[in-house]
């Protein structure tokens, strides 16, 4: 070989080597387990397809932190705990035990390229995908989530539990399977011979409170943890052709270790609430303009005045955590003080009777949109109280907007059940009860 041809040959090898290096560093395939095939035995052949090596799978929650709040003051539902994600949309509240999606730096799974068969017909390779929970870090307290999956107590954290689902994605579908507290099969993979199919693995989690908020002395911050939750591997499969001339083996000589980087979690004990300022109703008393008897007889209903109801929700002790506002939903119930039926369906406010008082008239309060009427209910902050409704404007974290309010209009209403329409003074009294949910 002359010098020139040697140099050309060397340069060609250099280019090939560089290309191979680039392919091997591709992050998409870095954690895909591939198969190696070997043939042994004669005259009865055994074709063995082996997945070698151990992999580590690191997953992290898509949200870096979750704030978990006890119920607002008047929320009697002790099960439906609410949470808010840092950097989530304004006032974003969702059940704490919704599924939390995760992310991984690389795709992880199994490739079946190289699993070949020259027999006719070929057997169907069935590889059970197994999950082994790491019970040194996860303690099953004997509870299940709403999907029937096991809830595990995190190591050294008695207040918090977690449940998992492993996602197995094929070319056509993504199936989620609950992780159990013992060795279990996630799914039996039907592996076709002579194909380039692969599966990728995914993980999602739910958090669960294992304690009642009333047992907490203070707010609790649970810092992020890198927790081993278990391992995944394939169970060995053996099969043969119809005449047993060739045996086939599929095996996994390693496993995939799963590590979950949990988000920061804040358990907010203080109950969310708002407060009334010195003048929650403005003006108070509400002064109505005078109307004439003939006008009301002609129209049956006439506007008499307006008032505004406002409550402040800017107390950071109750409504703020980790720099994020967590407001309750502010609702109100109006209750009549002068004999109106407070059953949540009646919308007429009875006026006072006596010397000099008008008769044949009641009052109706309409909400800010001018069409919905206030219906009177019992003096109670209980959730779902008859007549209870949500104030039109709810508190917002923007600027100094941490309050709830609504403007109401008061109407004179001709009411024959109150007697003949006679001019006089019109007085009525109603109270309101706030409910923070």
Curated annotation (Swiss-Prot):
InterPro entries assigned to the protein according to its UniProt record, in alphabetical order: Adhesion_dom_fimbrial, Adhesion_dom_fimbrial_sf, Adhesion_dom_sf, Bact_Fimbrial_Adh_Pro
The keyword Iron belongs to this UniProt entry's keyword annotation: no
GO biological process, one term: cell adhesion involved in single-species biofilm formation
Recorded GO CC terms: pilus
Subcellular location: Fimbrium
Main location, first listed in the record: other
Function: May be a minor structural protein required for pilus biogenesis. May be the adhesive component in the pili.
Protein name: Minor fimbrial subunit HifE
UniProt source species: Haemophilus influenzae
Species classification: Bacteria, Pseudomonadati, Pseudomonadota, Gammaproteobacteria, Pasteurellales
Protein encoded by which gene: hifE
């Amino acid at each position: 070989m002359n010098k020139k041809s040697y140099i050309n040959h060397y340069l060609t090898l250099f280019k090939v080597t560089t290309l191979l290096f680039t392919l091997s560093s591709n992050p998409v395939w870095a954690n895909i387990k591939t198969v190696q095939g070997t043939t042994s035995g004669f005259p009865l052949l055994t074709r063995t397809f082996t997945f070698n090596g151990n992999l580590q799978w690191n997953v992290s929650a898509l949200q870096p932190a979750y704030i978990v709040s006890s119920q607002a003051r008047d929320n009697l539902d002790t099960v439906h705990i609410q949470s808010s994600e840092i950097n989530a949309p304004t006032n974003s509240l969702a059940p704490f035990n919704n599924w939390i999606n995760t992310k991984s730096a690389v795709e992880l799974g199994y490739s079946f390229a190289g699993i070949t068969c020259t027999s006719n017909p070929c057997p169907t390779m069935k590889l059970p995908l197994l999950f082994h929970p790491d019970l040194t870090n996860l303690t099953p307290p004997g509870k299940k989530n709403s999907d029937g999956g096991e809830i595990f107590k995190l190591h050294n954290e008695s207040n918090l539990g977690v449940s998992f689902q492993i996602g197995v994605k094929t070319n056509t579908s993504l199936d989620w399977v609950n992780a159990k507290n013992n060795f279990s099969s996630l799914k039996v993979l039907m592996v076709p011979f002579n194909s380039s199919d692969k599966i990728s693995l995914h993980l999602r989690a739910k958090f669960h409170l294992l304690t009642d908020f009333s047992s907490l002395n203070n707010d609790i911050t649970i810092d992020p943890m890198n927790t081993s939750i278990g391992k995944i591997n394939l169970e060995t499969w053996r099969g043969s052709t119809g005449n047993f001339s060739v045996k086939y083996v599929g095996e996994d000589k390693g496993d995939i270790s799963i590590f979950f980087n949990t988000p920061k979690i804040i358990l907010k004990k203080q109950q969310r609430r708002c407060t009334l300022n010195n003048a929650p109703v403005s003006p108070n008393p509400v002064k109505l303009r005078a109307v004439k008897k003939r006008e009301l007889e002609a129209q049956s209903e006439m506007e008499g005045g307006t008032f505004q109801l406002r409550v402040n929700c800017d107390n950071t002790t109750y409504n703020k955590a980790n720099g994020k506002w967590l407001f309750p939903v502010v609702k109100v119930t109006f209750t009549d003080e002068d004999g109106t039926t407070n059953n949540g369906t009646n919308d007429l406010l009875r006026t006072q009777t006596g010397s000099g008082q008008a008769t044949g008239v009641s009052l109706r309060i309409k909400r800010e949109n001018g069409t919905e009427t206030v219906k009177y209910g019992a003096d109670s902050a209980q959730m779902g109280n008859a007549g209870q409704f949500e104030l039109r404007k709810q508190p917002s974290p923007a600027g100094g907007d941490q309050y709830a309010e609504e403007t109401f209009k008061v109407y004179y209403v001709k009411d024959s059940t109150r007697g003949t329409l006679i001019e006089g003074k019109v007085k009525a009294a109603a109270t309101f009860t706030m409910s923070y949910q």
